[in-house]
Curated annotation (Swiss-Prot):
InterPro entries linked: DUF905, YkfF-like_sf
Protein name: UPF0401 protein YubL
Domain of life (superkingdom): Bacteria
Organism for this UniProt entry: Yersinia pestis
Similarity remark: Belongs to the UPF0401 family.
Keyword line: Plasmid
Transmembrane segments: none
Entry keyword annotation includes Transcription: no
Lineage of the organism: Bacteria, Pseudomonadati, Pseudomonadota, Gammaproteobacteria, Enterobacterales
Length: 76
């Protein structure tokens, strides 16, 4: 039985939420870290396919979909 994947909330997100999601994938990472503000980035073959600042209202709508489509799960 597979474990449920953590996803980001529908609005802004915290560093803790971003770290939990990024820890599940090899190609999702926190970048442009400025302390309180940072981006969660999805890459494919090294190329960025989507990114969202943690403070963007509603920014996770597309980010969650790109993670679902392009995210490469880490081996468990």
């Amino acid at each position: 039985m597979s474990e449920a994947l953590a996803v980001l909330p529908d609005d802004t997100f915290t560093r803790e939420q971003a770290e939990v999601v990024a820890a599940q994938y090899t190609n999702v990472a926190i970048e442009d870290d400025q302390g309180a503000h940072f981006r969660l980035v999805v890459r494919q073959n090294g190329e960025m396919v989507w990114r969202t600042w943690n403070f963007e209202p509603g920014g996770t709508y597309w980010l969650n979909r790109y993670i679902a489509d392009y995210g490469i799960r880490k081996p468990q």
